[in-house]
Each structure stands twice: as structure tokens, then as C-alpha cells.
Amino acid sequence: ADCEHIAGELVKRFSRPRNLPNDIAKKLGPDLAQNLHGALPALSLPSMVGFTTAFVNDDVPEYAFAQQVLAFGKPGDILLGITTSGNSRNIVHAVKAANALGLESIGLTGQSGGDLASICKLCIQVPATDVPRVQELHLPVYHTLCQVVEDTLFP
């Protein structure tokens, strides 16, 4: 659910207007231009149910996210890997794939950081070990990330 939430906040405006480039706004016309926002291409890997079902039927499930990174990742992209322990094999494999492609990788984990702490370009470790508490602390972190991205890309 967190992945869906974050992707949604990036695809649409998060906290303030995101003006469309003038050339795009003109092509869209007034109605669309006034009701759409500057957008960022953000994908939630767990939401691709059709792919996931096919992959886990035919291949080793813990590599599904890494396969998606290979399919969709391109230079300049950032992979945000979220795992309370930092040791979720599916997330670790996805980060390794992202690193191999030259993507930036950010981990969002609990206190220890687990395996992600050593393989992500940046690992944000919240000060908790209890899973529900880690998840609660992740919310303000990813809202802050969304705000910083929006402020930077849509001044």
C-alpha cells in the first residue's frame, strides 16, 4: 500500500500546483490544461498483478521486482526500496538490478538497515525495530521525499 501511495503522490501533485509546460498546456487545450498537473513517471512494482502472477508461476518469486527493474529502469531513474528489516530478498535483488543498470537506489528501512544499508546509494533507517512502528515512521519520511522532489522539479 505504501508503494501505491508514494507513486500516486508523484504522478499527481503532492501539496501544491505543478504547472504544465506552456507548449503542452496549449496542445491540451484549456479544460485539460486547467485540470491536469505536471507529472512524474512513478511505478509501484507490487501493483503489476498480471506480471507478478505470470512470473511467480514460471520463475523464482523473489526475483520478480528485479525483473521489473530490468524492464523499466533507465538512466536517471531512482528505485525506492521499502522493507522494514532491510533484508527482504525481493527488494535486495531489485536494488542489485538497479545498481547494475546505473540507477540511483534509496532504501527505506528500520533501524538496522539490514542488507540494504550496504547496497543502496542512500539508506534511510528509521529509529525503530518493531514492524508497526517502523511502518508508522516511514510515512513522514516518504511524504518528505515527495515534498522535496516536488519542490525541486516544480519550483
Regions found by a protein language model. Name each.
Residues 71, 132-155:
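A charged, well-structured terminal subsegment
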Residues 46, 83, 109, 124-132:
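Short beta->alpha connector loops at strand-helix junctions that form conserved
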Residues 1-4, 62-65, 87-94, 116:
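Short glycine/serine/threonine-rich phosphate/pyrophosphate-binding segments
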Residues 1-72:
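Glycine-rich, small/polar surface segments that engage phosphate groups of diverse ligands
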Residues 79, 105, 123-125:
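Short, well-ordered beta-strand core segments
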Residues 107-120:
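Short, glycine/polar-rich helix-capping loops at beta-to-alpha or helix-loop-helix junctions
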